[in-house]
Amino acid sequence: SATCRKSMRLLPMGKKRAAQKLVIGDDTGCVLCFGTKKGEVETIFKTPPGGREVGRISLSGAGDEERVGIFWSCGTTIRACNRKGKEHLKFNTNLAEPIRSLHVEAEEIYAGGEYIFSQFTNCKDSAFFMAGDRINDLATEKISGAPKPDAVLGCQDRCVRVLTGSDLLYEASMDGPVSAVERYSNPPPAPGASGPGVGFGRAEAAEPTYELNDGRYKELLYGTENGLVGQLLCDASMMRRGWVISPIFEGRRGKSGGVHALSHDDVTHDGMRDLLVGRDDGTLEVWSFDLGPQPKLIFERSLQESITSLEAGFVTNVNYDELVVATYSGKLISFSSEPSTGEAGEAG
């Protein structure tokens, strides 16, 4: 079965530090949850078909396995269940467009259609915004100082837009149609600290010049259809550009597939969250900050098929990091840091 972008998520690890469970939605509207036990795949639950494809999956209470809620969109309907598959929400939004982007935080539901953004508080309309071009992705972050997180839209007209409720806080133009946006955060630097990612100002003269975060700014990641990945530093008044990964500057002109999946995790265990990038040409990349504030490529694989979702976690072994990838055709592929494996595990 085919999968849409961001329709695969890893559930948080429980207190017993058992392997993480995985949920994935397909083009029939089913959501499947499974885990691994003694090396065997074990189905936890499977929902009935939803009549339309699962457009997006979002988790609420994402830091707590016991309380996590699994939310997904099918057409204009949002449904939710608990980690055992018991459905507790079926909400027809009555929107004019199918929901392609979804984010859930506490009682807030943020939903992006083709051109229309809607926000619901306890399933009641609370905000509305019509974008100037297609909404490709949606994230949230507390930027404006308002009590509720602000919505961040990545749009086809090359703009990243930050909304406070129904109001546009500001927008900024990128160097390509924005296909992915993601919240990003590292631990704040200790007083007097130095090293990668610390300090606000200019990078070394040999590198492109860009702003650095000194802890005052909220950080976002964005990806574009023409292959760029970049950092944005945001506060209540404006958006500043941080580093940018450009396929041309990196000498990778032939490897500039559009960014479909963007995630981050400290897979190198150096205290900085590494960038995980999945592209529409099947390229999987990990970028690290080991050597300075500009990310460096440390891992790359070509899967020969468009990547729709990408997460890091512990699915088959709690002692070794894994990159879990979902492809357009519904394949799930795991890349493990376990020395003895050598090869990736794959599930259809």
Please give the residue ranges for each predicted region.
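Beta-propeller-forming repeat regions
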Residues: 1-348
